[in-house]
Curated annotation (Swiss-Prot):
Cofactor(s) it depends on: Zn(2+)
Family of this protein: Belongs to the SprT family.
Domain SprT-like: 22-165
Keywords: Cytoplasm, Metal-binding, Zinc
Pfam families: SprT-like, Zn_ribbon_SprT
Protein's name in the database: Protein SprT
Amino acid sequence: MSTLRIPIALQQAVMQCLRHYLQLANQHLGTAYPEPKINYHQRGTNAGSAYLQSFEIRLNPVLLLENKQPFIDEVVPHELAHLLVYRQFDRVAPHGKEWRWMMEQVLKVPASRTHQFEVASVRSKTFNYQCKCQQHALTIRRHNKVLRGESEYRCRQCGEKLQFITINPD
């Protein structure tokens, strides 16, 4: 997989946003939490991930490049809030009351669990399977497990084993 280059101006905008919200949090909480590490290695349809123990935020470079400022404004505080909640409260529900409080009361941003960015460019190819009652789209990972004989999947409605039909033209 080739690494996408994130323009320096976009990286600076990410860091400016991160520092703004971290400063807000440190002032509000009376803490001196360090700056988390940021990298651009998140894959798939997730916009970002917070790695709690390593105090690191991973951002999806494709979604960042496609959405720029709206991505920064939404995803950076969202992931930072996860890190801050972990430092402040230890292990709690990922989008629980502590996280909502951190987002809304401390960082002063809406607490949204999921992004609404277009993901067609990062969605993985799927494979069509069928049972008695409907068609199912399996990811490449699940499809490969079926091919290797490591897994079989059944329909939740009828209970029948899924049978491979075709590759989706995504």
